[in-house]
């Protein structure tokens, strides 16, 4: 099966999600699947795009036997809520354009749903390609942000709750 793994975090980043996602990719390859990855330029946790990746909007290349599509991101300079939102949205928009124009012939789009805004991108690319969409939900959004006190705006909470339900109802 040909699988596109869609995630904001991927090596050479060394944060938790990038590590387990890389392990998942390697395990699926060992099981005989073909893998491609659509991800952001590495920037976490420093908040700046890593050397060797700077100054690019898109990049395609093979990394450890995997075709990796990297898409522009505005790295968050701080851990502040709105900086992270801007970062999430920048990757959402750039990955939509890259995914819809460059990804070809996949059977499944396995999406790590952080941020929530990646769901509609995965669904749009999946519809274009006739691929099934699987969501991997790591955090309970938007409830984690609400509980931490980072999200208090009632309108924004309703929008994110709507997006959460939309994602669940449109995944395969």
Q: Each predicted region: which residue ranges?
A:
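Short glycine-/acidic-enriched loop or helix-start segments at secondary-structure transitions
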Residues: 15-16, 47-48, 80, 119-123, ...
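An aromatic- and histidine-rich active-site surface loop
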Residues: 84-98, 108-138, 142-143
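A conserved catalytic-core segment of Leloir-type glycosyltransferases
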Residues: 39-94, 98, 103
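Membrane-proximal helix-turn-helix segments that form the acceptor-binding/catalytic region
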Residues: 31, 100, 117-120, 124-129, ...
């Amino acid at each position: 099966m040909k699988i596109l793994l869609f995630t904001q975090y991927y090596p050479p980043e060394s944060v938790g999600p990038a590590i387990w996602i890389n392990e998942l990719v390697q395990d699926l390859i060992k099981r005989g699947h073909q893998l491609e990855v659509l991800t952001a330029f590495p920037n976490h946790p420093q908040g700046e795009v890593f050397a060797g990746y700077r100054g690019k909007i898109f990049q395609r290349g093979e990394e450890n036997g995997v075709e990796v599509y990297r898409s522009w991101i505005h790295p968050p300079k701080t851990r502040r809520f709105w900086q992270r939102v801007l970062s999430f949205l920048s990757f959402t928009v750039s990955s939509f354009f890259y995914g819809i124009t460059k990804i070809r012939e996949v059977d499944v789009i396995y999406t790590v749903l952080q941020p929530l805004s990646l769901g509609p991108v995965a669904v749009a690319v999946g519809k274009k390609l006739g691929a099934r969409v699987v969501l991997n939900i790591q955090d309970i959004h938007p409830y984690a942000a609400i509980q931490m006190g980072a999200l208090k705006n009632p309108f924004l909470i309703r929008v994110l709750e709507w997006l959460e339900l939309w994602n669940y109802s449109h995944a395969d």
